[in-house]
Amino acid sequence: MSNLNNLRHKLQNGLIASCQPVPGSAMDTPEIVAAMACAALAGGAVGLRIEGINNIRAVRRATDAPIIGIIKRDLPDSEVRITPWLEDIDALSAAGADIIAFDVTCRERPVSVADLYQRARATGCLTMADASNIDDGLLAHHLGIDFIGTTLSGYTQATVPTEPDLALVTQLAQAGCRVIAEGRYHSPALAAAAISAGAYAVTVGSAITRIEHICGWFCDAIKQCETEKLTEY
């Protein structure tokens, strides 16, 4: 089995932990990101999604588990945020990423999806498309991108849904894509539903690694219960 096939095999039917702290939070240091990654692997995760060169370097030093690497940028002339530039591809490969993920949505962008893909292939890394809908995903699949993620489904519109896009997982899987389900998988049951829908693997982020979000969910539920009690009287 080749190294690339071995990497694909490691991820199949597994959990990928996205270790991306809230920017600027108490957890937002490379050392803590690496610790979160190791804890996720100890819990059974088979791969990691890591943002930022320093974070990837820290995680690479700590483990040889598969890393999906991204760089997020806020550009003045494009809504594309995930790995928008060719130099990002080079930097991610040099930092130790095994798989390079990039936005493949049909929006104004500084570099074409095809050029990003070709640059990533030239590094020897596997590739992942962060798609928002079936058209994005199929275009990426036809280019030859290794994994198609549902990462951006619901995030290119004004209102973000609360539930994951399982229908998109099914559509892409039926089209022959290796689908990495991602986006709003906040419970084990939803992650299992993604695999049942045909996902190759499932990425979970906030529900595992963003303490602020998790605490917020609990606090909101408690407040809702308190409100319901008050309305009974």
Swiss-Prot record:
Its EC number is 5.1.3.9. InterPro entries: Aldolase_TIM, NanE, RibuloseP-bd_barrel. Keywords: Carbohydrate metabolism, Isomerase. GO terms for cellular component: cytosol. The keyword S-adenosyl-L-methionine does not apply. One of its GO terms (biological process) is N-acetylmannosamine catabolic process. Pfam families: NanE. Pathway: Amino-sugar metabolism; N-acetylneuraminate degradation; D-fructose 6-phosphate from N-acetylneuraminate: step 3/5. It catalyses: an N-acyl-D-glucosamine 6-phosphate = an N-acyl-D-mannosamine 6-phosphate. It is an enzyme of class 5 (isomerase). The keyword Isomerase applies. GO terms for molecular function: N-acylglucosamine-6-phosphate 2-epimerase activity. Belongs to the NanE family. Converts N-acetylmannosamine-6-phosphate (ManNAc-6-P) to N-acetylglucosamine-6-phosphate (GlcNAc-6-P). This is Putative N-acetylmannosamine-6-phosphate 2-epimerase.
